[in-house]
Amino acid sequence: MLRGSMIPLILCVLAGCAAAPVATVPKPVEVKVVVVTMFEIGADSGDAAGEFQLWHERQKLDVRYPFAHHHDLFFNPKTGVLGMVTGVGSINSASAVMELGMDPRFDLSHAYWLVAGIAGVDPEDASIGSAAWAEYLVDGDLAHEIDAREIPADWPTGYFALRTKKPYDPNKPAPGGEMFRLDPQLTEWAFELTREVTLDDDAGLKETRSHFVGYPNAQKPPFVLKGDTLSGMTFWHGKILNEWANRWVAYWTDGKGQFVTSAMEDTGTFQSLTYLHSTGKVDKNRVLVLRTASNYTMPPPGMSAAEHLLRENDGYAGLHASVEAAYRMGSVVVEELVGKWDIYREHRPPLTP
């Protein structure tokens, strides 16, 4: 039994507890567009630009949010544009996008996602400095592989799809991460919106593409096109692997896709977005992938794959032009979405009458 002298003390303590202020949870910040880049070279401004720097500087992404991943997030509260740098490779992009999607600081339920990065380009399709909007994202990692020196004589390659019995087996399973298709109408809308954008050309690009004799598209000045991307953690190179990439993309898209660019992250990025979509945190139908050509995926005639790859390792011939193209093209789309947010928040483009 409590003694009478203790009762006032207990009541006083309880009253004090009841009067303590309750911490309020800040309202999530609404994001209109997430710009997904994969790497930066040095600082975020003032030096040689990687994929993120031009977005940081020109879109005034000045508000920094600490982010327990490869790179902090940067935001423009006036426009609602959020920029991220995932790190290179699908393991980085998948984990970064998942972390952002689960971040309670942001409301991403109506956000559009623009992947804007550089890539290798098939000289059959385009030149360095060009920009390609992808509709199909095909994964180049999920597969079986037998060394080419041990494969049956009638096999064209030792690389073949999981749960199949031979290369390009028509009895393939339904894609389980090997292929994703973006909203085709949204992709077409972005292409039409940007197809007349003038892309940079210079003497260095002209000299590089002049060696691709017999590849008319590789010798054109930079241009805008639609073309699909192959994602893989291995930086491959050469004519034989380029032929494989074309067949692999055609195989997984049932001939509807066209391999144009080679990158590392996009299937990982989109896989995370599909999981987040199922929770209602994001809309996977609001995703665009823009890849701009920094280098060719195979050497020009008369040069070996090894020689060409090692030369590219010293610096991509089209790095500056491709980084500029990614911003120039992507910013047209971003500014259209932000400028008409009263419409595009609820209705995806293209708008039908």
Report each predicted region and the residues it spans:
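N-terminal secretory signal peptides that target proteins for export/translocation
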Residues: 1-2
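Accessory terminal and edge-of-domain segments that mediate assembly/interaction
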Residues: 19-353
